[in-house]
């Protein structure tokens, strides 16, 4: 998404500076107008933000386990007796978000982690069998495993949710509407020329991702 945003905004004279923060902090910084927007947002993550009309792709939220686990995700009831690992501030699905809110104070059922590199930590916790399952977007997981060697690939135990994913802009920033419109126009242009598919393919993503 960063490469797509850079190409689109460069055409309008903007430089995109990407900074890596924990998700909850990213949302807070955007709300304080200290950054312009956040990458990879579902509408449930930040309903108060300004969203473009066009999504950047589709998020597919998977439930991952230790490679030797045989457990399958079949809805919330299948989480009984399991510890679900999640990242602070993320939205996963309406169903999972309610479950997390209900049990966020019960570490036997929901374990919330944060920080600038939570995915690597989550994979280590899975490998050490300190948690049962971890929720993450499939494309993010695939990219991370390609870019970071040394992590044992987890096992996908089921898909919990699919939803459009966006770059979202702070509602308090007076230029957020303009940035959202530029992004929409740029995405349409890249899709029409085929450039969007080329960028996605460089990350192992298809048109639908």
Enumerate the language-model features and the residues they cover.
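Extracytoplasmic small-molecule ligand-binding "clamshell" domains
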Residues: 1-49, 115, 183, 189, ...
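Extended ligand-binding regions for polar small-molecule ligands
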Residues: 2-11, 77-85, 90, 169-206
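Ligand-binding cleft/hinge of the Venus flytrap
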Residues: 5-12, 54-56, 90-116, 123, ...
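Alpha-to-beta junction loops
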Residues: 14-15, 31-40, 82, 118, ...
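A ligand-binding cleft/hinge motif common to bilobed small-molecule-binding domains
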Residues: 25-31, 40-49, 98, 132-161
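Hydrophobic/proline-rich hinge and linker segments of small-molecule sensing/allosteric domains
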Residues: 53-74, 167-170
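Periplasmic-binding protein-like
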Residues: 59-61, 149-184, 204-209
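Flexible hinge/capping segments at coil-to-helix
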Residues: 66-84, 99
